[in-house]
Regions:
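Conserved strand-to-helix beginnings and helix N-cap segments that scaffold or border functional pockets
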Residues: 64-68, 128-129
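Generic N-terminal amphipathic, Lys/Arg-enriched alpha-helix
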Residues: 7-18
């Protein structure tokens, strides 16, 4: 395993210690493993895919008062500390900045690396674990599971 990836794993594990269960190391590890698997079949920069996947939820805005710059700042500082090249850092930060579900309507020239990490993150949102993550986050935010007084929002 590449040293930068090993250092990133250690950093992410330490940083996400005690994080909300739906956005913890185990989620990050699943996304990383899925991204690695997808990347093997694509023409992409494997290191950018792996490090982006590892850092994608390092400071999720949902848990930091909506601050969308914190993850970028933390990631950039860390990547500079481990001596990554500026061009590679820029590409990783691009993925982290644009991975969010809420950016899906935006016109954006996506890189292959961004598409891979987005797909991996979205795949982790499916199935039993994805459903469990959704309920866990709702509980974390003290949301009701169901309220018959709230009518569905039909589009």
């Amino acid at each position: 395993m590449n040293q930068n990836i090993s250092l990133t794993i250690d950093f992410v594990k330490k940083t996400l210690e005690g994080a909300e269960a739906g956005h913890d190391w185990f989620h990050t590890e699943r996304v990383w493993r899925l991204a690695k698997l997808i990347a093997k079949t694509e023409n992409c920069n494997q290191e950018i895919v792996e490090i982006s996947a590892l850092l994608h939820d390092i400071a999720d805005p949902k848990f930091h008062n909506g601050d969308e710059t914190l993850a970028l700042d933390i990631s950039e500082k860390f990547l500079n500390e481990i001596g990554m090249e500026a061009q590679v850092i820029e590409q990783i930060l691009f993925v982290i900045k644009h991975i969010s579900f809420k950016n899906k309507g935006e016109t954006l020239e996506k890189t292959k690396e961004l598409e891979i990490v987005q797909d991996a993150d979205r795949l982790d949102a499916m199935g039993a674990i994805g459903i469990a993550r959704t309920f866990n986050f709702g509980g974390y935010k003290n949301n009701l599971i169901y309220n018959p007084d709230i009518q569905p929002n039909i589009h």
